[in-house]
Amino acid sequence: SAACEPEVVDLARFLNAMGAQITGAGSPTITITGVKELHGAEHEAIPDRIEAATFAIAAACSRGEVTLRGVRPDHLHAVLDKLQEAGVGLERRGGDLTVKAGRGLRPVDVTTQPYAGFPTDAQAQMMVLMTQARGISIITERIFESRFMHVSELARLGADITIEGPSAVVKGPSALSGAPVMASDLRASAALVIASLVARGRTLVKRIYHLDRGYEKIDEKLRRLGARIQRHSDA
């Protein structure tokens, strides 16, 4: 069956504006009728929902208040619902989303699912947040196998996480401390950066080329929000 993600719907809209004949985008069945040619068109791409989720979780982890502009909260229901369940304050105003960290984070269980369920691409970031919640959280990965490579690196920072089959059991809150860590993929690298914001002391995240595949100038954006973060050419 076809993926139902907003990005698929947005691409179909763009191609249709260029003269394509595509129906069913956003459903399990997409029908494409061939055309002789495509023509030019103007199209505004939708905002990156995973980048928005990453910054929202980072704000919650660092006990800050951040307003994300130009987001689509309707594309983030599963993530925002879990953040609210964890005690994170959210305020929606049009295309703006303000994230206000609560006084105490509550543990929540998360299971990754196809859209519109909780996205696997926000699983690692959410795990970092749960290391700061008081209690036990269970994060279950149902989309990809072996997508817990970040667990051992989070453990280097002091996280208490145990893998049990497709699930990771997170016990919190953990007082994270800086240490050298190594990113294994795109979202794991984002999770390690978030954990570094929480950790006391200096953390060096290696292999940040993973990070650049999915985030544009994330270090500069975090620095503008007050983070003490520097990029090293040999990282």
Model-derived features with residue positions:
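Short, structured segments at the rim of ligand-binding sites
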Residues: S1-A235
